[in-house]
């Protein structure tokens, strides 16, 4: 996975995990899973509800938070310029 993808995914998933935000995860086959993000890595998301499920990221279509989440994707300018 590219580094740019991680710059969006990691802060978003981390905010959902830290704030215990309920989420709906839609899979590419249309199945809807609900719960809270327990953990994640480059390939999987652990989703906790009554049980913990390991969901492979390649099977995920959409993640919908149950409420608004603030997460930072700010990165320093590549050329060191802060304009």
Curated annotation (Swiss-Prot):
The keyword Disulfide bond appears for this protein = no
A GO biological process held by the record: regulation of RNA stability
- Role description: RNA chaperone that binds small regulatory RNA (sRNAs) and mRNAs to facilitate mRNA translational regulation in response to envelope stress, environmental stress and changes in metabolite concentrations. Also binds with high specificity to tRNAs.
The species this protein was found in: Acidovorax ebreus (strain TPSY) (Diaphorobacter sp. (strain TPSY))
Q: What is this protein called?
A: RNA-binding protein Hfq
Which NCBIfam families does the record cross-reference, listed alphabetically? Hfq, PRK00395.1
Domain of life, per UniProt, equals Bacteria
Question: What keyword terms does UniProt attach to this protein?
Answer: RNA-binding, Stress response
What is annotated about its quaternary structure and interactions?
Answer: Homohexamer.
Pfam families linked:
Hfq
- CDD domains per record: Hfq
Which Gene Ontology terms of cellular component type are present?
Answer: cytosol
Q: Which residues form the Sm domain?
A: 10-69
């Amino acid at each position: 996975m590219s580094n740019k993808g991680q710059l969006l995914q990691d802060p978003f998933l981390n905010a959902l995990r830290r704030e215990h935000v309920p989420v709906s995860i839609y899979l590419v086959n249309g199945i809807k899973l609900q719960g809270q993000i327990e953990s994640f890595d480059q390939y999987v998301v652990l989703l906790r509800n009554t049980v913990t499920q390991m969901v492979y990221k390649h099977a995920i279509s959409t993640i919908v938070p149950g409420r608004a989440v603030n997460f930072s994707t700010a990165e320093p300018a590549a050329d060191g310029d802060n304009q």
